[in-house]
Amino acid sequence: MSVYDKHQALSRLTLGKPTPYHDRYDAALLQPVPRSLNRDPLGIYPDSLPFHGADIWTLYELSWLNNRGVPQVAVGEMHLNAESLNLIESKSFKLYLNSFNQTTFDSWESVRATLANDLAHCAQGDVSVTLFKLSELEGQPLAGFTGECIDDQDIQIDNYNFNADYLATNEQDAPVVEETLVSHLLKSNCLITHQPDWGSVQIHYRGKRINREALLRYIVSFRHHNEFHEQCVERIFNDLMHYYQPEKLSVYARYTRRGGLDINPWRSNTPFNAPNGRLPRQ
């Protein structure tokens, strides 16, 4: 259980509550969650962030009406800067997108600009939005994380409660390496509803070699942990910095789709390119 899952900032959210669906545009449906909820306990403060990054959202269920009443459909891609004061709560995002369904817009650009403006206002940060016609995405192959997968280790695991101290199992004389490690065994739970969130995580670093067994046990220990996607990625980044102090560190997670949305947060203390390629489970 998170130390802040009963915080008053979460009590007003529609998440986990019966909610009517609106099909007329309503920006007020968007609900923010302060990033400080998980950052403050980790000692992460906005004036000295240890990383830069973004939350990359893919919007699969986006539709509106053109001036002649003909429905339009698109796939959207939204990048929310990690320096924003708030993250966007995903159920409210879904309800907000539903409100476009029977709303008339003059152009695709009007839709894009409306999305960008509303999301930036809710998050109190920088947002970019791109809309794709379906024909632009047809035939795109599934992507994969580059790096060495650590999932097939011959170990036994019998504890699935979150424990960052697994990472304390490091070698004092470990050599300095630069490598990319990947796991597809990241599973956490929604902070409010406790529904499972399934993800893959890529960790690129330069520093003392990370103990791969310890890292896998640490990742698996998220299975009973309740936090939003973005918060889990920041926790992983923070814990790796605490135990290993790498010179360079990038953490990128891609989660499976729910409600027509997938969320793919990344955090890094070095220049980092986060390709938005759909993984097999997405």
UniProtKB/Swiss-Prot annotation:
Binding-site residues, substrate: I88, E89, S90, H229, E230
Pfam families: QueF, QueF_N
Highest taxon in the source lineage: Bacteria
Record keywords: Cytoplasm, NADP, Oxidoreductase, Queuosine biosynthesis
Swiss-Prot/TrEMBL catalytic activity: 7-aminomethyl-7-carbaguanine + 2 NADP(+) = 7-cyano-7-deazaguanine + 2 NADPH + 3 H(+)
GO cellular component, one term: cytoplasm
An MF annotation (GO) of this entry: preQ1 synthase activity
Subcellular location: Cytoplasm
Gene3D superfamilies named in the record: 3.30.1130.10
Pathway entry: tRNA modification; tRNA-queuosine biosynthesis
Keyword Coiled coil set for record: no
InterPro entries, per database record: GTP-CH-I_C/QueF (IPR043133), NADPH_dep_7-cyano-7-deazaG_red (IPR050084), QueF (IPR029500), QueF_N (IPR029139), QueF_type2 (IPR016428)
Role, per record: Catalyzes the NADPH-dependent reduction of 7-cyano-7-deazaguanine (preQ0) to 7-aminomethyl-7-deazaguanine (preQ1).
Name of the protein in its database record: NADPH-dependent 7-cyano-7-deazaguanine reductase
Organism: Pectobacterium atrosepticum (strain SCRI 1043 / ATCC BAA-672)
